Regions:
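Short, Lys/Arg- and Gly-enriched loop/turn segments at beta-strand edges
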Residues: 89-95
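Short Cys/His-rich zinc-binding micro-motifs
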Residues: 10-18
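Residues immediately within or flanking Cys/His clusters that coordinate Zn2+
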Residues: 5, 23
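Aromatic- and Lys/Arg-enriched surface recognition patch
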Residues: 97-168
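Compositionally biased, charged N-terminal/linker segments
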Residues: 17, 24, 31, 36-77, ...
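Short cysteine-rich clusters marking metal-coordination/redox-active sites
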Residues: 8-11, 26-29
């Protein structure tokens, strides 16, 4: 638990587990830190044959709406996300931050044209989604699946073991290693 972090819902500052245990209040603004404020890390996966993310990201590199098909109750504003493409060139292609809590909402109109099967758009009416703000896009130097499989710190990631799905939890150890390897790929 010592590497757990909490994000204050009011001021947005990140608080260490030690600070959380000692006081339960944000040292920056005084807001009570509930256990739900625990910062989490995720992989959000897309299938390029179903959603043309690479085309989409060329048009808008700022924000994007994503389904939270699994873990909607665990995903929160402020959590960090690695964007993973499935398929032949599977791997991490972007890093982002969730900027909304999960909610039921129609798919943003500008995203509709990137779905190869327009019937898939209905999922946004029935399931929860979040908006992600992209912090780093690494299309030209992704962290590929084979690199993750070879790395002892990443080889047990859920997206590698059971790759069917949209959302996968990451540990802080996974997250830090992903960032480290992305920086080495520069």
């Amino acid at each position: 638990m010592g590497d757990t972090e909490f994000k204050c819902r009011k001021c947005g500052k990140v608080v260490s587990f030690e600070q959380y245990i000692s006081d339960r209040f944000c040292p920056y603004c005084g807001t009570f830190l509930s256990p739900r404020c625990q910062l989490k890390y995720w992989v959000f996966q897309f299938n390029p044959a179903i959603y043309r993310w690479f085309d989409r990201i060329e048009e808008n590199k700022e924000t994007e709406q994503w389904l939270t098909s699994q873990y909607a109750k665990d995903i929160h504003e402020g959590d960090k996300v690695a964007i993973w493409a499935s398929g032949e060139k599977a791997g991490v292609y972007a890093i982002g931050e969730i900027i909304t809590n999960p909610r039921k909402s129609l798919l943003a109109t500008e995203q509709e044209k990137y779905w190869t099967n327009k019937e898939d758009i209905y999922k946004f009416r029935e399931k929860y989604s979040v908006t992600i703000k992209y912090l780093k896009i690494i299309i030209d130097r992704p962290l590929l699946e084979y690199q993750c499989n070879k790395d002892p710190a990443l080889a047990d990631m859920a997206v590698l073991k059971q790759p069917q799905g949209t959302n996968f939890p990451l540990t802080k150890k996974h997250w830090n290693r992903i960032l480290e390897l992305i920086d080495k790929n520069k």
